[in-house]
UniProtKB/Swiss-Prot annotation:
InterPro entries, per the entry: Mss4-like_sf (IPR011057), Mss4/transl-control_tumour (IPR011323), TCTP (IPR034737), Translation_control_tumour_CS (IPR018103), Translational_control_tumour_p (IPR018105)
Name under which the protein is recorded: Translationally-controlled tumor protein homolog
Gene3D superfamilies attached to this UniProt entry: Metal Binding Protein, Guanine Nucleotide Exchange Factor, Chain A
Similarity section: Belongs to the TCTP family.
Subcellular location field: Cytoplasm, Cytoskeleton
Record bears the keyword Cytoplasm: yes
GO terms, biological process: translation
Function: Involved in protein synthesis. Involved in microtubule stabilization.
Record-level GO cellular component terms: cytoplasm; microtubule
Keywords recorded for this protein, A-Z: Cytoplasm, Cytoskeleton, Microtubule, Protein biosynthesis
Domain TCTP: from-to ranges: 1-170
Phylogenetic classification of the source organism: Eukaryota, Fungi, Dikarya, Ascomycota, Pezizomycotina
Length: 170
């Protein structure tokens, strides 16, 4: 099993147990689902009486996103201006990390070009549709995971910056 950690702060963000699709060589997308968390069903083995009304108890179940829940991602908010300012600093930090790790100048240039194109073509036009999440540590300098819904309006998916993840085999 592979766990993908934030390269800047070490937060666990995703694993290969989710179907990761690489998009444009710059991000990973992972489809996720809304699951019911905390529902407990107690079966005491008794037959329900036809005369008694069924008891409807609130069992504390809540619908949560499976990736957000599994990796304890923390919801955060941005307006377009503050997100783009954050992203500028984040991309500089990733570039520095790539240089530190010995990536070639061509790879770094490809990252910068690809990231800029992805932001311009995908994030900015759909900005109002995204939800934003940080890792468990809530480090403001770490990766902000994007969550949106597919064209069907029902299937949620998350977006992770490929170069901002470090693969760890477990």
């Amino acid at each position: 099993m592979l766990i993908y950690n934030d390269i800047l702060n070490g937060d666990e963000l995703i694993s290969d147990s989710y179907d990761l699709k690489e998009v444009d060589g710059i991000v990973y997308e992972a489809d996720c689902a809304m699951i019911e968390e905390g529902a407990v069903e107690v079966n005491i083995g008794a037959n329900a009486s036809a005369e008694e009304a069924a008891e409807d108890l609130d069992d504390g179940a809540v619908k949560v996103n499976n990736i957000v829940n599994s990796f304890r991602l923390q919801s955060t908010t941005f307006d377009k201006k503050s997100y783009l300012a954050y992203l500028k600093g984040y991309m500089k930090a990733i570039k520095a990390k790539l240089q530190e790790n010995g990536s070639s100048a061509e790879d770094i240039k490809a990252f910068e070009t690809g990231a800029s194109k992805f932001v311009k073509d995908t994030i900015v036009p759909k900005f109002k549709d995204f939800e934003f999440y940080t890792g468990e540590s809530m480090d403001p300098d770490g990766m902000v995971v994007l969550l949106n819904y597919r064209e069907d309006g029902v299937t949620p998916y998350t977006i992770f910056w490929k170069h901002g993840l470090k693969e760890t085999k477990v």
